[in-house]
């Protein structure tokens, strides 16, 4: 098995001359095909490892040079028991008002004067009662690291950086599901990785997989760590050594091909680093999931991710031209970077959505576009959610959707309004009041029924303005009123700070989560209504004293349907086992989604949290096909995170 996994890189190690000949042929063929020359990865890996080990004693763990957003010691920059950066959090200031700390976001340092009242009134929260939680990881509470000494010795000889420290291992034992974060604050996981390894390139990954096969170890890959499907949780009964293979140091753009508008990147690069570096050359991918700051290209591929601007740029399956994955059987990749092939079932679709069960994605070629010259925000207020959905359906039918369009139901609109920062200008405050008066009094909109769509247009300026008029004309036919560019822009600026709200809630006995689905257009309204009602009913039956927050928004539109996001939260004071209540309610909501014609997931993936419904979602035969692929590619279950199957 280990020999099979070695692939071309392993053969090169055994026969250096043959390896050099193969690399020369590959480079030569690349020239003949007009493709960008790829630097010989093996030599580059050796150079990086040599640099990382300079000054280190042979017995020491090599300390590789770092770059990119995510350092090896993630806990130095990011929260170990919550979302995002250490310096950014919502808190109550000395005046009892909510503000966001730090300087990273447009909302940072600003006061949100109405959010406190909204939290109290909506969820029955008493701000005099705070929860207690651990302030740091206690190494003595972490399960001990058990690692084969022969494996460690070979890892050192390969000069691959690693750690067995408790804080490094705990940080990579989880994603960001409510259960995981709650457990971090209150206790400890039953099982965590035994060792964290940091490959710096494709060939390092090949060596790690070879060693795992040789010693029968379990590998769980991790990119940005933003999973919301229990995808990173270690199986409690796994007796083998668990390796957390952290791709964060594989974070380079290897080349940009301006003729074919593609970029070849390492899979550990984060979305924000990728977009920032491409922008320096005048390009972008346009792929912007809400987790853009921390999620990685490899993570996008392995979960079949979607970005908010998919209407222009496509989902991840539309963006990927080529990819490389290391498996226990060897390396999977196509021989051509052609834009489309008719060569049987597309092997890319075995890799996309595989969620770390087959191997490690190491590199990918993705489409890029010139950075748009013009960008404009907008918003539309509708009398109710139903008319808003009808408008979005018509926009999709006419295929004129802007880069992004999101429709909030009334409760989410109210929540968004509560996140509005304090206005310093009397004139601005007066204008806001005038707009509200016009919509509610003059136009007769009920404040408790209003639904709002936020819009983002981008591209050529003249075309954007034409496109904008077309969308607003359609909206008017469904009772929609233009609600201003500022409201639209604020809606999108909140994208990257919403996740921080949950951490504030946890301090005051509020637990919550978001989940998503996709559904045909004719099921959207019924599905939204029934799922929200099911959440309220389940909470009441399970002893939740205050009505839960149960809200939704339509976030993506397609010819044949839409993606819907749900948010729910409740005050758990007085409940002895809040996690059980929460998980039963979330499972009931998923059952309701499936009963109403929704999908198991649109882009979060299956992981372990939704795997119980996978067989009924894809049929017995489809499930058997997935199992057969797994059994062939990974017969010893080296990639043993137990997602999907």
Curated annotation (Swiss-Prot):
Binding site for substrate: 502
Molecular function GO terms recorded: alkylglycerone-phosphate synthase activity; FAD binding
Keyword check for Transmembrane: no
KW Phosphoprotein (keyword) present: yes
Residues marked Important for enzyme activity (site): 406
Transit peptide feature range: 1-45
Biological or metabolic pathway of the protein: Glycerolipid metabolism; ether lipid biosynthesis
Biased composition range(s): Low complexity: 1-10, 50-69
Catalytic activity line of the entry: a long chain fatty alcohol + a 1-acylglycerone 3-phosphate = a 1-O-alkylglycerone 3-phosphate + a long-chain fatty acid + H(+); hexadecan-1-ol + 1-hexadecanoylglycerone 3-phosphate = 1-O-hexadecylglycerone 3-phosphate + hexadecanoate + H(+); 1-hexadecanoylglycerone 3-phosphate + a long-chain fatty acid = a 1-acylglycerone 3-phosphate + hexadecanoate
BP-aspect Gene Ontology terms: ether lipid biosynthetic process; lipid biosynthetic process
Active site (record annotation): 565
Residue numbers spanned by region Disordered: 1-72
Broad class of the protein's primary localization: membrane
UniProt keyword list: Acetylation, FAD, Flavoprotein, Lipid biosynthesis, Lipid metabolism, Membrane, Peroxisome, Phosphoprotein, Transferase, Transit peptide
Complexes and interactors: Homodimer.
Name assigned to this protein: Alkyldihydroxyacetonephosphate synthase, peroxisomal
